[in-house]
UniProtKB/Swiss-Prot annotation:
Expressed by the skin glands. Residues 1-22 form the signal peptide. This is Phyllokininogen-1. InterPro entries: Frog_antimicrobial_propeptide. The modification 4-hydroxyproline is found at P54.
Length: 62
């Protein structure tokens, strides 16, 4: 009976460890996706609202 308990605890422990590793990898993947989305949004904002009006040149052309 004690052998069954030990093996059951071992199986449950290993399952818990593998589950937590999978959850950690999933969380890291979601964070990377969020960072990519934030970078894309900031790039789009830079394109939409430039610091200078379109056609503006800081140099004078005579």
């Amino acid at each position: 009976m004690s052998i069954l308990k030990k093996s059951l605890f071992l199986v449950l422990f290993l399952g818990l460890v593998s589950f937590s590793i999978c959850e950690e990898e999933k969380r890291e993947a979601e964070e990377e996706e969020n960072e990519d989305e934030i970078e894309e949004e900031s790039d789009e904002k830079k394109r939409e609202s430039p610091d200078r009006p379109p056609g503006f040149s800081p140099f004078r052309i005579y």
